[in-house]
Amino acid sequence: MEEEGLECPNSSSEKRYFPESLDSSDGDEEEVLACEDLELNPFDGLPYSSRYYKLLKEREDLPIWKEKYSFMENLLQNQIVIVSGDAKCGKSAQVPQWCAEYCLSIHYQHGGVICTQVHKQTVVQLALRVADEMDVNIGHEVGYVIPFENCCTNETILRYCTDDMLQREMMSNPFLGSYGVIILDDIHERSIATDVLLGLLKDVLLARPELKLIINSSPHLISKLNSYYGNVPVIEVKNKHPVEVVYLSEAQKDSFESILRLIFEIHHSGEKGDIVVFLACEQDIEKVCETVYQGSNLNPDLGELVVVPLYPKEKCSLFKPLDETEKRCQVYQRRVVLTTSSGEFLIWSNSVRFVIDVGVERRKVYNPRIRANSLVMQPISQSQAEIRKQILGSSSSGKFFCLYTEEFASKDMTPLKPAEMQEANLTSMVLFMKRIDIAGLGHCDFMNRPAPESLMQALEDLDYLAALDNDGNLSEFGIIMSEFPLDPQLSKSILASCEFDCVDEVLTIAAMVTAPNCFSHVPHGAEEAALTCWKTFLHPEGDHFTLISIYKAYQDTTLNSSSEYCVEKWCRDYFLNCSALRMADVIRAELLEIIKRIELPYAEPAFGSKENTLNIKKALLSGYFMQIARDVDGSGNYLMLTHKQVAQLHPLSGYSITKKMPEWVLFHKFSISENNYIRITSEISPELFMQLVPQYYFSNLPPSESKDILQQVVDHLSPVSTMNKEQQMCETCPETEQRCTLQ
C-alpha cells in the first residue's frame, strides 16, 4: 500500500487560506476578527467554505441522514454494525464520514478509516465526492488507493480502496493496525476479495477488540449476514419510491427488436428523462448502439438522442448528471445509456426516468477440470433486478421495463447473485491464503465455501508452478510470486525472465495483458482501415511480441510529442485505446518498482535479437506451459493439450490477419463460448516446450496424439535419459497429491 502511483487529481500540497484576510492593508484587524467567528473544520483547522454548507444541505436530504444518531450510538457500543440500504440512500459517502468523525473524537488512537469498494471507478469518484463534502483536499485528509495508483499520505484520515488492495495490505500488515474502522461496502457484489475479507476479519476482530467493522449491503443479503456474524445491530435505511414495473405478457425469443422499439417509443412520447438499457453482453451494446445512432435524428423536433455506451470491464467514465453548461443547452438531449451486468455502479445520475432490463447476462464460469472459463447465458438474480430498479432513485414517475415475464422473474431468477468464489479461478486467492498463513492467519471462515474441486485445481497449479514446497507451504518462488499483483502464471513468467535476461520485455507483456484491451472499438465501416493500421505493429513471432511493438511505438510517440493531444491523436489514427496504453505504462512502472524493491536481476533491453526472442518464449513457457495448443488439421483448429476442446485463433490475432497458422502455440486466454477463441498467442516449438515443462505435469497429461508427438520429441532429444525421467515422474506424482491440501 506504500507504493507510489499516479498523481492525485486536484491534489495540492498547499492548504487553503481565507481570502485576503492576512493582507497587511488597513482594516485587517476587523477581517481577522470576523474570521474568528467562522466555524472551523476539525479535520484541517480551517474555516468551512460556503460550498461546504451547500453540500451539507444536500447531504441532510439523503435517506441515510435520519439514521446518523442511531448509527453513531451503535458504533460506540458494538464492534460490528451492518447498514442495510438501497443503491441511492447515501450510505457509501456518509457512513465513512461519520466513522471519520468517530475516529477524530477518540484522537485516532486506534487509527483512521478505510472503506472498500469492488470497482475502481467508484473508489475514485467517492473519494473526490467525500473530500468535497468534508471540505478538505483530496490526497491529504481523504484519499484513495486502487491497483497501481496511490493517492494517500501518512496523514490521510479516510481512505477509499478496492477490496483487493486491502486484501494485499494484509500480506504485510495482517491485523490492519493502521485502521480503527474498516468499512466493507457493496458486499452484495460477492467478489472474491470481499468474501475473503469477511472471513479473515473475523479473526482480526478477535485479536483487536478496539477495531470496528461496518458492513454496507443491499437488503437482500441481510438475513445471510445475520446468520454469518450472529446477533449484530442492523441499521435499516428506508428509501422507497413508487416505480411502475412493466413485464412482458409472454416470453420473446429475441429481445433486440423490443429494446429498439421501446427506446424510440419512449423518445416519441415526449416524456423527459434519460434511458438506461441493461444488455446481456458487450457485443449487444455495439449492436444496439449502431442501430440507435442511425435512428437518433429521425424526429429532430423531439430533441437529440445521445447514445452513451458504458463498458463496466473497461476503464470508462461514470454516467453522471449534466453540468450547468450542458443544462443551459437550447436543444433538449435525451441520453440512452447502454451497459451490461455490473453497470449499475456506473450510473450516478438522477436524470434517469426509464430502465429497460433484458433479464439475462453472459457470465464467466470457471471449469477447473479443463482450466478454462465458459461463457454462459444465465438469468440475472432477483437482487440484481431490484438494484437496477433502484437506479430510478427519487423519480416519482420512473418506469422499469422488464423484457421478461413475471413468472420468469419469480421462477427462473435466483434470489441472490452467485458468489464469485464459486464460479472463478481460485489460484490467486489460494496463493494469497498461503501467504497469509506465513503471517499467522491461515483460517478463513468463508460465507460460501468454494468447491473442493476448484481448491484442488488451484493447489495443483501452484504446485506445478513451483510455488509450493514439499509440505504444501509457499516456497521461496511462491513468496516472491505473491509480491506481484498479477495472476500466478504471469508472476512466474516474470521470475523466469530474470533467469533468461529478458525482464524488460516480459514486464511490457505483463503490463499490456493486465491493462484493458489496447485495441479500440472500431466503428462500423472502419474495419479494413483499422486492420491496415494494426498490421504495422505485427510481429512474426506472435501476439506477445506484437504487444511489445505497440507499447514501444506508444512510448516513442509520447517521447517525441509536444502535447498529450498529439499522443491521443496518434492513438485515434491507429485505432488504439489511449487510456489503456497509459494504464499499461503505469502498471509497467509499478512492476519495475517491485523488481527493484525485492532486488531481482534486471537485464538491459535487447528486443529484436534472436537470442532475446528465444528467451522471451522460455520465460512465457515457464508460466504458461499449461496453456499450449496444437493445430490438428492445418486449418487453424487448435486442440488443447490438457483436454479435448478445440478452439480457433481470435480474429485480432496476428496469425489470423496474416493467415499463417503455426502448428504449436502458447496462449494467454481461452474461453468456451460460441467461437471458442484462444487469445494472445505466440508460436512455440515442441522441443522448447519439453525442455521447460515440469516432468510430473507432462506425465499427468491425458493420452492424446499431441502427447505422443511430444514423447517422440523427448525420445529424440535424450533417448538415454528417458528411463530416469519416467522414474522421476513416478516419484514426483505421489508427492504432488500429498502437497495439494489447504493447510
Curated annotation (Swiss-Prot):
<keyword id="KW-0547">Nucleotide-binding</keyword>
<dbReference type="Pfam" id="PF04408">
    <property type="entry name" value="HA2_N"/>
</dbReference>
<feature type="region of interest" description="Disordered">
    <location>
        <begin position="1"/>
        <end position="28"/>
    </location>
</feature>
<keyword id="KW-0496">Mitochondrion</keyword>
<dbReference type="InterPro" id="IPR011709">
    <property type="entry name" value="DEAD-box_helicase_OB_fold"/>
</dbReference>
<feature type="short sequence motif" description="DEAH box">
    <location>
        <begin position="185"/>
        <end position="188"/>
    </location>
</feature>
<dbReference type="InterPro" id="IPR007502">
    <property type="entry name" value="Helicase-assoc_dom"/>
</dbReference>
<comment type="similarity">
    <text>Belongs to the DEAD box helicase family. DEAH subfamily.</text>
</comment>
<keyword id="KW-0378">Hydrolase</keyword>
<dbReference type="GO" id="GO:0005739">
    <property type="term" value="C:mitochondrion"/>
</dbReference>
<dbReference type="InterPro" id="IPR027417">
    <property type="entry name" value="P-loop_NTPase"/>
</dbReference>
<keyword id="KW-0347">Helicase</keyword>
<dbReference type="Pfam" id="PF21010">
    <property type="entry name" value="HA2_C"/>
</dbReference>
<feature type="modified residue" description="N-acetylmethionine">
    <location>
        <position position="1"/>
    </location>
</feature>
<dbReference type="GO" id="GO:0004386">
    <property type="term" value="F:helicase activity"/>
</dbReference>
<feature type="domain" description="Helicase ATP-binding">
    <location>
        <begin position="72"/>
        <end position="238"/>
    </location>
</feature>
<protein>
    <recommendedName>
        <fullName>Putative pre-mRNA-splicing factor ATP-dependent RNA helicase DHX32</fullName>
        <ecNumber>3.6.4.13</ecNumber>
    </recommendedName>
</protein>
<dbReference type="InterPro" id="IPR014001">
    <property type="entry name" value="Helicase_ATP-bd"/>
</dbReference>
<dbReference type="GO" id="GO:0003723">
    <property type="term" value="F:RNA binding"/>
</dbReference>
<dbReference type="InterPro" id="IPR048333">
    <property type="entry name" value="HA2_WH"/>
</dbReference>
<keyword id="KW-0007">Acetylation</keyword>
<dbReference type="GO" id="GO:0003724">
    <property type="term" value="F:RNA helicase activity"/>
</dbReference>
<keyword id="KW-0539">Nucleus</keyword>
<dbReference type="GO" id="GO:0005681">
    <property type="term" value="C:spliceosomal complex"/>
</dbReference>
<dbReference type="GO" id="GO:0005524">
    <property type="term" value="F:ATP binding"/>
</dbReference>
<dbReference type="GO" id="GO:0016887">
    <property type="term" value="F:ATP hydrolysis activity"/>
</dbReference>
<feature type="binding site">
    <location>
        <begin position="85"/>
        <end position="92"/>
    </location>
    <ligand>
        <name>ATP</name>
    </ligand>
</feature>
<keyword id="KW-0067">ATP-binding</keyword>
<dbReference type="Pfam" id="PF07717">
    <property type="entry name" value="OB_NTP_bind"/>
</dbReference>
